[in-house]
Amino acid sequence: MPEAPKVPEIPDWQKPPRNVSLRIHAGENLNTTPNNEPHALIVKIYKLRQNSNFQQLPYDVFLNTQKEKEMLATDLIEVKEVTLIPGQKFQFEEKVTREAYFIGVVGLYRAPALNRWRLSFAAENVEKTGITIGAHGCALTVGAGQVIETANFNPKFLNETRCQ
């Protein structure tokens, strides 16, 4: 009896988008000044084809929308901005196309802590768990979602984080 033909695998671009739950909890001490006065914080959410470029760009690139688009080039699929106020909890379902393999998050802090203002996640890994991020005085933390590439710190905790 002849073997049944194998069903071809569906290419990523034909699969339905992923639904990723994104939660950002802003602390009461959000984006603080040297006098510990809290301020609003802009958080940018990126849908990316690749994340290596995103991980290497310096902070100031993300402050300039045009420069950011030029530097991320073809890696960038979409970027959204959310403005948070101290104590706010923000939650939404994000549709992530299959061509976006990564989700990046940047907190545009007044004085960001070294290496604590940017996070990236593999979209496939956070489809089930979602992403929960804490936004604090000068740093981001992660409550849910597996982070890619953290440089010598545990993204779940603020210990040893120094605001400038």
Predicted regions mapped to residue ranges:
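Short structural boundary motif marking the start of a folded domain
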Residues: 16-20
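Glycine-rich, aromatic-bearing surface loops/beta-hairpins
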Residues: 118-164
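Mid-length scaffold segments of soluble, non-membrane domains
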Residues: 38, 45-115
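Outer-membrane beta-barrel proteins
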Residues: 10-12, 31, 82
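Short amphipathic, basic-aromatic surface patches that mediate peripheral association
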Residues: 22-34
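Gly-Asp-aromatic-enriched flexible segments
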Residues: 21-22, 114-122
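A generic structural micro-feature
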Residues: 14, 35-37
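Bacterial Sec signal peptide processing site at the extreme N-terminus
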Residues: 1-14
